């Protein structure tokens, strides 16, 4: 027996989503369409063969045009010390001011890599699916850099929090999650 789908009010959905903790990332791009970036928590792993991330971007975002036209992104995983930078990239601040607030480098695609992020996933956009107000980007990881993940920044209950390990050795390359 198939259940009938019922409409869920957007505010009820947002309230329930506040119960879902998520890593905080800054997604960046650079290329002929310009340099841009935005704060995102709607990111997850799709598969490790080939390495692919899912990144959601609101089509109303100031970074949208640059991201979709450049067809490259870097997902910069933030640590606790990056909360102010996350707020900057999540606001209405011009792109040049956002990028001036931190040190950046690049990997394979030319998308900006935050110098002291926990990890950076440098990607080419392989596919895009339009859903409601957002595009879901399937991003093929072509390079990555891992700087250490001892105190990552998460967003939960409409607030920033820190999650991490007290012993940096616990954040080594062979974690239980890496094995899945």
UniProtKB/Swiss-Prot annotation:
Enzyme class, broadest EC rank = oxidoreductase
List the EC numbers from the record.
1.5.1.42
State a single Gene Ontology molecular function: riboflavin reductase (NADPH) activity
| Gene expressing this chain | rutF
Q: Which Pfam families match?
A: Flavin_Reduct
- Lineage, highest ranks first: Bacteria, Pseudomonadati, Pseudomonadota, Alphaproteobacteria, Hyphomicrobiales
Q: Which family does it belong to?
A: Belongs to the non-flavoprotein flavin reductase family. RutF subfamily.
Q: Print the keywords alphabetically.
A: Flavoprotein, FMN, NAD, Oxidoreductase
Q: Which species is listed as the source?
A: Bradyrhizobium diazoefficiens (strain JCM 10833 / BCRC 13528 / IAM 13628 / NBRC 14792 / USDA 110)
GO biological process terms, alphabetically, are:
nitrogen utilization; pyrimidine nucleobase catabolic process; uracil catabolic process
The catalysed reaction is:
FMNH2 + NAD(+) = FMN + NADH + 2 H(+)
**Stated name of the protein:** FMN reductase (NADH) RutF
What does this protein's UniProt record list under function? Catalyzes the reduction of FMN to FMNH2 which is used to reduce pyrimidine by RutA via the Rut pathway.
């Amino acid at each position: 027996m198939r259940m009938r789908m019922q409409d869920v009010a957007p505010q009820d959905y947002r309230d329930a989503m506040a119960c879902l903790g998520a890593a905080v990332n800054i997604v960046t791009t650079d290329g002929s369409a310009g340099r841009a970036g935005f704060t995102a928590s709607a990111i997850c792993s799709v598969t490790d063969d080939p390495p692919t991330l899912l990144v959601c971007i609101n089509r109303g975002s100031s970074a949208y045009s640059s991201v979709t036209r450049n067809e490259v992104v870097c997902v910069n995983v933030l640590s606790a010390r990056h909360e102010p930078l996350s707020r900057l990239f999540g606001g209405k601040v011009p792109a040049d001011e956002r990028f001036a607030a931190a040190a950046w480098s690049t990997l394979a695609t030319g998308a900006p890599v935050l110098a002291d992020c926990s990890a950076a996933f440098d990607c080419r956009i392989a596919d895009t699916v339009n859903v409601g107000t957002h595009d879901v980007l399937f991003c093929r990881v072509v390079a990555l850099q891992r700087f250490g993940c001892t105190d990552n920044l998460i967003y939960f209950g409409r607030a920033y929090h820190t999650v991490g390990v007290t012993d940096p050795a616990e954040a080594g390359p062979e974690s239980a999650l890496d094995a899945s």
